[in-house]
Regions:
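Hydrophobic alpha-helical connector segments
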Residues: 71-102
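Short, basic, alpha-helical segments at the C-terminal edge of helix-turn-helix-like DNA-binding modules
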Residues: 56-68
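Hydrophobic alpha-helical segments that form the core
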Residues: 143-164, 178-184
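Short, amphipathic alpha-helix enriched in basic
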Residues: 2-37, 45-52, 56
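C-terminal peripheral helix-coil segments that are non-catalytic and often amphipathic
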Residues: 165-194
Length: 194
């Protein structure tokens, strides 16, 4: 098992421990997974608080990569519009996040944690959206891509905030909101002409 696989495994273990309401201990995890503890300590050498941010970062990055690979396979030969491809990717991302909603709420329960998580995930999601637009066939220059990614990221954050802060909201409602929001944004012809 290589270091990337170990990191992904540890991040998954961390998120799953939150979902199950179990405590998380790297020493116990190393025994459970039969991985040398010194390797795990080398990969995650920081304080527990910093390591938790790293687990979240790795977990989200893995989700993003899986979504991009799935989208690339599904849309490669599809005759869908640029809008439909972006919308589909957002739907898939929110369906995946909904599975981990409880863990994400717990990780963002304190205001200071919410800010740190926001900063990490905002930057990471911006990169995800840039890759997604390229995957969907966007050929605009990098500057324009960044403007579009910032706009799309703001829609993502708005809907993620609703998902995590409103207990009664359903994934169907989030998807309906995303559809409406994206349609408004795609009406900006100087940005979205694809």
């Amino acid at each position: 098992m290589n270091n990337f696989e170990i990191k992904y495994l540890i991040a998954d273990q961390y998120i799953n421990s939150i979902l199950k309401g179990e405590s998380f201990d790297l020493n116990l995890i190393s025994k459970k997974l039969k991985i040398d503890n010194s390797i795990i300590q080398t990969l995650f050498p920081y304080s527990e608080k910093i390591n938790k941010l790293e687990y979240l970062n790795i977990f989200n990055s893995k989700l993003d990569d899986e979504i991009l690979i799935l989208i690339n396979k599904e849309i490669r030969d599809e005759d869908a519009t640029y809008f439909e491809k972006i919308l589909e990717a957002f739907f898939i991302k929110f369906e995946n996040l909904d599975k981990y909603k409880r863990a994400l709420i717990i990780l963002s329960s304190e205001k200071k944690d919410k800010l740190l998580n926001f900063l990490i995930l905002n930057n990471q999601n911006h990169k995800f959206i840039l890759k997604l637009m390229k995957c969907c066939g966007d050929k605009d220059l990098y500057f324009k891509l960044n403007i579009k990614a910032t706009l799309l990221n703001s829609l993502y954050i708005k809907n993620l905030n609703e998902l995590l802060n409103r207990e009664e909201i359903t994934i169907d409602k989030i998807m309906s909101n995303l559809d409406k929001d994206l349609k408004k944004v795609f009406e900006l012809p100087f940005l979205f002409k694809n």
